[in-house]
């Protein structure tokens, strides 16, 4: 079971690196293969893990740095549209608690207002169909 989770994470990382390389086409600067540029914002993929959601199901949790390069404060939640797919089907969001006493979830950082030039770590969680099939994530800037 642990070995299949490691394979899934490797496949996810490969998919995100491919996505980020396509997103950054045409730029002259040295490229970080985990950096995704979305207009006024940048996402830096930091990793993924499988956690248990509030109902005991397997969920994938992506960790990203969200940088606001715009001129006004912005939050990840209202700036980035994310889609996560597995087996050709869009995955549902998952509720993964970090503190059951306060009901804090892994996605709390998405609500943080980020000043221009600042960066905040965000996480996002989705219910997995299985722990062996690859997962593909795409990100777009909200217009």
What are these regions (language model features)?
Residues 1-23:
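Sec-dependent bacterial lipoprotein signal peptides
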Residues 19-35:
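Sec-dependent signal peptide cleavage junction
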Residues 30-32, 44-50, 105-110, 122:
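Short structured motifs
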Residues 37-41, 87, 140-143:
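Short strand-coil-strand connectors
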Residues 38, 43-45, 61, 76-77:
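Hydrophobic residues on conserved beta-strands that form the core of alpha/beta folds
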Residues 54-55, 67-119:
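The feature marks short-to-medium sequence segments in extracytoplasmic or secretory-pathway proteins
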Residues 60-68:
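Short, well-ordered beta-strand segments enriched in hydrophobic/aromatic residues
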Residues 120-143:
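Short, surface-exposed ligand- or partner-binding patches at beta-edge/loop junctions that are enriched
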């Amino acid at each position: 079971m642990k070995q299949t989770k490691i394979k899934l994470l490797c496949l996810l990382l490969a998919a995100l690196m491919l996505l980020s390389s396509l997103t950054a086409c045409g730029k002259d600067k040295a490229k970080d293969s985990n950096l995704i540029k979305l207009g006024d914002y940048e996402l830096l993929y930091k990793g993924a893990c499988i956690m248990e959601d509030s109902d005991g199901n397997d969920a994938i949790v992506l960790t990203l740095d969200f940088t606001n390069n715009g001129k006004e404060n912005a939050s990840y939640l209202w700036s980035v549209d994310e889609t996560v797919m597995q087996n050709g089907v869009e995955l549902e969001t998952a509720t993964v608690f970090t503190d059951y006493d306060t009901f804090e979830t892994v996605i709390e950082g998405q609500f943080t207002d980020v000043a221009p030039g600042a960066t905040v770590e965000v996480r996002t969680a989705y219910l997995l169909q299985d722990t062996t099939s690859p997962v593909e994530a795409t990100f777009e800037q909200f217009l």
